[in-house]
């Protein structure tokens, strides 16, 4: 028996556009049913099975709730090979990455919390635009290569957003 598709676990059709509230509600419903505590008095085999189901459910939920991870997952299940590390041949985006990194470094050096907040808002806007672009590409099977490029941009912005959150925490201390 194969591992069910993440979308199938939540009884959703595979696609990029998701109702995240519906996903969260369904996750909570399913999580209650497989929570390991419910199997405390069960056999060791049933406990292990519940733990595995819970872990698989958590992994599926984390993947689907993140636009970048959802995009990568969709590309993967559609048969589009997506290597983890790849040289990006996108000079415009590489330049943008360098500018963002320099700006983040300047914000760190100046300990500018207001500047960090403004930077974070701009990143959020850029992420939302990429999400919309990916969704449009995903709807057109002829644009899978463009969808992969957009997914890589989404992953970069996720990583940069994580670094911004870390900087905020350091500056708050």
From Swiss-Prot:
Gene3D superfamilies tied to this protein: DnaJ domain, HscB, C-terminal domain
Top-level taxon of the source organism: Bacteria
Gene: hscB
Cited Pfam families: DnaJ, HSCB_C
Keyword set, alphabetical order: Chaperone
Subunit field text: Interacts with HscA and stimulates its ATPase activity.
Annotated ranges, domain J: 5-77
Keyword field contains Phosphoprotein: no
Name of the protein in question: Co-chaperone protein HscB homolog
Free-text function comment from the UniProt entry: Co-chaperone involved in the maturation of iron-sulfur cluster-containing proteins. Seems to help targeting proteins to be folded toward HscA.
Gene Ontology terms: biological process: [2Fe-2S] cluster assembly; protein complex oligomerization; protein folding
GO molecular function: ATPase activator activity; protein-folding chaperone binding
SMART domains xref list: DnaJ
Transmembrane domains' residue ranges: none
GO annotations of cellular component type: iron-sulfur cluster transfer complex
Family membership noted in the UniProt record: Belongs to the HscB family.
């Amino acid at each position: 028996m194969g591992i069910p598709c993440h979308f199938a676990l939540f009884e959703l059709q595979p696609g990029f556009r998701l109702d995240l509230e519906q996903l969260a509600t369904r996750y909570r419903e399913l999580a209650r049913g497989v929570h390991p505590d419910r199997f405390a008095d069960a056999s060791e085999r049933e406990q292990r099975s519940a733990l595995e189901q819970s872990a698989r459910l958590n992994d599926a939920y984390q993947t689907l709730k993140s636009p970048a991870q959802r995009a990568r997952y969709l590309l993967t299940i559609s048969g589009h090979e997506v290597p983890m590390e790849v040289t990006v041949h996108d000079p415009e985006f590489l330049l943008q990455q360098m500018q963002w990194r320099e700006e983040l470094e300047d914000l760190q050096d100046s300990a500018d919390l207001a500047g960090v907040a403004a930077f974070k808002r701009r990143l959020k806007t850029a992420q939302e635009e990429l999400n919309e672009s990916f969704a449009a590409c995903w709807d057109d099977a002829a644009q899978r290569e463009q969808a992969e490029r957009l997914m890589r941009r989404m992953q970069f912005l996720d990583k940069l957003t994580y670094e911004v959150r870390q900087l905020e925490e350091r500056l708050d201390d």
